[in-house]
């Protein structure tokens, strides 16, 4: 079951800055089923049945690691709800994407990332490589087998659809956006190292929360306003907020 987001932790009382924001995680909580009615698993199956090639990918050398990853996830759920990406195992080289199943992406496609090193995966995010690239690589190299780490990443969206694959061309936020028609798109992320292959397993869950309801708490509203108003312009454009953040803040 999903815990309510800790909005005060996600939006600290400070100007916006890129941050890893990692903390010790709980594999059982993250990978066990959150949706007791099975709707999330059903939607996942529907998209995969429609076009699996858009959401799944695997390099030839990744077969053993993928089998290990699927077996590991099956220890928590027979139909895992999170998306997942598998990174190469060598701690002495920059990890690159070797496999995954990403049904609910935030405006990116797994096929475009397959085979790429993390520096290339993160390259579209303004400032990330300069500010955090070295720290990310060091952290990934030090992850121990069966350890668990979690973080969140937030964005805003014009709908509460989970599947934001770029091929869908969904409506975007713009100059007429309002809080009641805007959702916080929250990515819950998980990292561990598989014990046999050494591959890095990266899990992603997406939840959507209507902005006007979240900001009913005055302190939360003030912190979100501060984050939006201090978001650097290149990042605001990357997140699709450059035309509307003053309306939403």
Where are these regions (language model features)?
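Extended, well-ordered protein cores
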Residues: 1-249
